[in-house]
Amino acid sequence: MSKIRVLCVDDSALMRQLMTEIINSHPDMEMVAAAQDPLVARDLIKKFNPQVLTLDVEMPRMDGLDFLEKLMRLRPMPVVMVSSLTGKNSEITMRALELGAIDFVTKPQLGIREGMLAYSELIADKIRTAAKARLPQRVLENKPAMLSHTPLLSSEKLIAIGASTGGTEAIRAVLQPLPPTSPALLITQHMPPGFTRSFAERLNKLCQITVKEAEDGERVLPGHAYIAPGDRHLELARSGANYQVRIHDGPAVNRHRPSVDVLFRSVAQYAGRNAVGVILTGMGNDGAAGLLEMHRAGAYTLAQNEASCVVFGMPREAIAMGGVNDVVELNQISQRMLAQISSGQALRI
């Protein structure tokens, strides 16, 4: 079996050395070359034809975003960004995902060597996922036509969405067409702490609905989307007649916190047939069991189709478990969700 060929682009000699050690410690991949800046990387890409590129965000001569934009236009390939955990860099990382990066890794703030080596399995998993990924289609910067939707008379209706690899842009594609009269949405996207606030703020600028990072105890309102904070579970709860957000630090589920299964199970319990469940692109099986619970509770459930997924893992598992009513292309999901909510026919078997 041939190894995954990886090229590292980072201006730090230590980071290049550590990434080389990490990649070469896994038998199914190899570091074919390492470059200190994008201009050197350009020549090495031609020479070694890597399958996956790891790219630092901040570098001299040409920054990572400029290089990524040119790369995706001229020679599209799977890219995993490597970013320091700062407010500025979290915004840059979100922009990189918009430009077509598959995923990202955060650099440890202290103890670089020990921290990076501790991330060895995580980095290897992201490299493997990137190597198999379908390159995402760019979502246009201009806003798509807003869907028409009759204002709801009840705040009982609710939409739950789960995603992982490739999910930031898929979520954007689903939320942008939604009108302000849409039902509330609860969203779990696998993401580390420090990035979900930037993700929510960026979506809020692009969408007609209000998008925010979820806060424990807040009331769930129509026309609002609530994003699970990084490294914390998001659940639906009730306070009297009202839906409420619950945020907690429970153990990881399916190796993830936040976990899509945790969200979906709570929605099955408290919203039942008043809910719509949507599982989007992502590696693994998180969300499959929870979506089945939603389906059994009477919710209408959707999975993104393989052709429009960056990674057809989570949707595939959900379909295989029998918890999916319909499999839909990404650009049709918004319309299908609202049509189902408006029809009032959440239960479909």
From Swiss-Prot:
Lineage: superkingdom? Bacteria
Question: What does its UniProt record remark on the domains?
Answer: Contains a C-terminal catalytic domain, and an N-terminal region which modulates catalytic activity.
Catalysed reaction(s) here are:
[protein]-L-glutamate 5-O-methyl ester + H2O = L-glutamyl-[protein] + methanol + H(+); L-glutaminyl-[protein] + H2O = L-glutamyl-[protein] + NH4(+)
Q: Name one GO cellular component term.
A: cytoplasm
Top enzyme class, one word, equals: hydrolase
Q: Does the keyword Transport apply?
A: no
Give GO terms for biological process.
chemotaxis
Q: What is this protein called?
A: Protein-glutamate methylesterase/protein-glutamine glutaminase
Native species: Yersinia pestis
The record's listing under InterPro entries reads:
CheB-like, CheB_C, CheY-like_superfamily, Sig_transdc_resp-reg_Me-estase, Sig_transdc_resp-reg_receiver
Residue ranges of the Response regulatory domain? 5-122
Name the active site residues.
164, 190, 286
Record's family?
Belongs to the CheB family.
Under the heading HAMAP family, the entry gives:
CheB_chemtxs
Q: Which residues form the CheB-type methylesterase domain?
A: 152-344
Q: Which residues carry this modification: 4-aspartylphosphate?
A: 56
Task: Give this protein's Gene Ontology molecular function annotations.
Answer: phosphorelay response regulator activity; protein-glutamate methylesterase activity; protein-glutamine glutaminase activity
Q: Where in the cell is it found?
A: Cytoplasm
